[in-house]
């Protein structure tokens, strides 16, 4: 299972979470987000050898991006053609589905199946719906309200990736070392327990 830590705004936080076990760090490029960072932040992280995802909220911002990142995370409704176009540019794709019921989820899952990772997000807490989404596929991950309190339930569902952000912060965009260390320890403990 991979772990993505999102909302990264500084190289030092990207390095810290990677050293502790994150597989991917996410940089939000939406200027309206309190966790907004720039393409230069992505480039700096990528040049440090850290796997990074740029998080986009519109197709227009993807198409105008220099794409310094390893993964392009599409946090908006999109079609399979955009996924293919990004693959043609040599980048991997994370397609996000905001959970709005199982029927909608299955429709979007089928539309996004060419993505490298399909991330199901549920802001109210994805752990409350894992039983509904666990059977979807091998490339499905979870996001939304994940913290060290529900990590055993999440890991037991065997997602390909989990995505965490605000539960590891001291303030928006700034990761708290103690919270990060505690979270990764809980993950290791839960994985030992589940396996």
From Swiss-Prot:
Coiled coil: none annotated. InterPro entries: Aldolase_TIM (IPR013785), PRAI_dom (IPR001240), RibuloseP-bd_barrel (IPR011060), TrpF_fam (IPR044643). GO terms for biological process: L-tryptophan biosynthetic process. It catalyses: N-(5-phospho-beta-D-ribosyl)anthranilate = 1-(2-carboxyphenylamino)-1-deoxy-D-ribulose 5-phosphate. One of its GO terms (molecular function) is phosphoribosylanthranilate isomerase activity. Pathway: Amino-acid biosynthesis; L-tryptophan biosynthesis; L-tryptophan from chorismate: step 3/5. It comes from the Archaea. Keywords: Amino-acid biosynthesis, Aromatic amino acid biosynthesis, Isomerase, Tryptophan biosynthesis. Its EC number is 5.3.1.24. PANTHER family: N-(5'-PHOSPHORIBOSYL)ANTHRANILATE ISOMERASE (PTHR42894:SF1). Belongs to the TrpF family. This is N-(5'-phosphoribosyl)anthranilate isomerase. The lineage of its organism: Archaea, Methanobacteriati, Thermoplasmatota, Thermoplasmata, Thermoplasmatales.
């Amino acid at each position: 299972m991979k772990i993505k830590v999102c909302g990264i705004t500084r190289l030092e936080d990207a390095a810290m979470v990677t050293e502790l076990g994150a597989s991917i760090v996410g940089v939000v490029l939406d200027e309206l987000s309190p966790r907004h960072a720039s393409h230069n932040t992505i480039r700096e992280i990528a040049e440090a050898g850290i796997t990074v995802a740029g998080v986009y909220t519109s197709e227009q911002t993807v198409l105008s991006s220099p794409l310094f990142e390893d993964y392009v995370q599409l946090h908006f409704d999109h079609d399979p053609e955009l996924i293919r176009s990004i693959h043609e540019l040599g980048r991997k794709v994370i397609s996000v589905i905001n959970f709005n019921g199982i029927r909608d989820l299955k429709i979007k899952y089928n539309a996004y199946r060419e993505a490298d990772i399909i991330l199901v997000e549920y802001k109210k807490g994805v752990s409350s719906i894992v039983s509904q989404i666990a059977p979807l596929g091998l490339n499905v991950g979870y996001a939304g309200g994940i913290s060290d309190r529900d990590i055993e339930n999440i890991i037991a569902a065997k997602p390909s990736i989990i995505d965490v952000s605000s539960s590891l912060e001291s303030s928006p965009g700034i990761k708290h070392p103690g919270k990060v260390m505690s979270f990764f320890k809980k993950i290791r403990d839960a994985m030992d327990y589940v396996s």
